[in-house]
Amino acid sequence: MTILFLTMVISYFGCMKAAPMKEANLRAQGSLAYPGVRTHGTLESMNGPKVGSRGLTSSSSLADTFEHVIEELLDEDQKVRPSEENNKDADMYTSRVMLSSQVPLEPPLLFLLEEYKNYLDAANMSMRVRRHSDPARRGELSVCDSISEWVTAADKKTAVDMSGGTVTVLEKVPVSKGQLKQYFYETKCNPMGYTKEGCRGIDKRHWNSQCRTTQSYVRALTMDSKKRIGWRFIRIDTSCVCTLTIKRGR
């Protein structure tokens, strides 16, 4: 009886006790940190609470931890972006650049984190509210169809820098243990989409519309016309926007 009693006590306190949530460590993976470009970290040692036989562990702890990590990363990214006062004409946002030995299989980390944050927000809704908040169920469509993909310097070859000059984008960056390729995450208007003849949802009786690819500046290793190699801000495709002009009366 004594052994049975001790076993029951140990089991009881074992179920009541939950392992503490360890802090998520962010470690840079497979890319070189260089001026203006942040390395992409991974959520590595994320150990959640141990789930007991009675299901005493709450999933909100894990969600709160992920939200905390996401907010820290997004806040850190805001510090990387220059102030609007010093940069009204160019967006220096450089999370679209990655140095890697192979083609990245997923979008940049911050893109995934924003999607996951939206998923966490939706997870807190009731099933009915979640269905009504789904853009597909509300009939929401993008004004312009766009595509995003990773491209290499071999695809770009040349680019325009901030001074308006044409520079050669170097395909490989030398590092201590070899070389890494430069990859750029570009977004542009989809030439095979349904909006190549004009923006979606625009009244053609009163407006002329066109989907256009816009560019932003990112930092990359380049070579100018004088064979000088260095890190420069170059323009890459980053979005597809709708431009409108009013139709004049005849």
From Swiss-Prot:
GO terms for cellular component: axon; cytoplasm; dendrite; extracellular space; perinuclear region of cytoplasm; synaptic vesicle. Pfam families: NGF (PF00243). The record marks 57-58 as: Cleavage. GO terms for biological process: cell surface receptor protein tyrosine kinase signaling pathway; modulation of chemical synaptic transmission; negative regulation of neuron apoptotic process; nerve development; nerve growth factor signaling pathway; neuron projection morphogenesis. Disulfide bonds join 144-211, 189-240, 199-242. Residues 19-131 form a propeptide. InterPro entries: Brain-der_neurotrophic_factor, Cystine-knot_cytokine, Nerve_growth_factor-like, Nerve_growth_factor-rel, Nerve_growth_factor_CS. Mature BDNF is produced by proteolytic removal of the propeptide, catalyzed by a FURIN family member. In addition, the precursor form is proteolytically cleaved within the propeptide, but this is not an obligatory intermediate for the production of mature BDNF. Can be converted into mature BDNF by plasmin (PLG). PROSITE patterns: NGF_1, NGF_2. SMART domains: NGF. Keywords: Cleavage on pair of basic residues, Disulfide bond, Growth factor, Secreted, Signal. Important signaling molecule that activates signaling cascades downstream of NTRK2. During development, promotes the survival and differentiation of selected neuronal populations of the peripheral and central nervous systems. Participates in axonal growth, pathfinding and in the modulation of dendritic growth and morphology. Major regulator of synaptic transmission and plasticity at adult synapses in many regions of the CNS. PANTHER family: BRAIN-DERIVED NEUROTROPHIC FACTOR, NERVE GROWTH FACTOR NGF -RELATED. Belongs to the NGF-beta family. This is Neurotrophic factor BDNF precursor form. It comes from Bos taurus. The lineage of its organism: Eukaryota, Metazoa, Chordata, Craniata, Vertebrata.
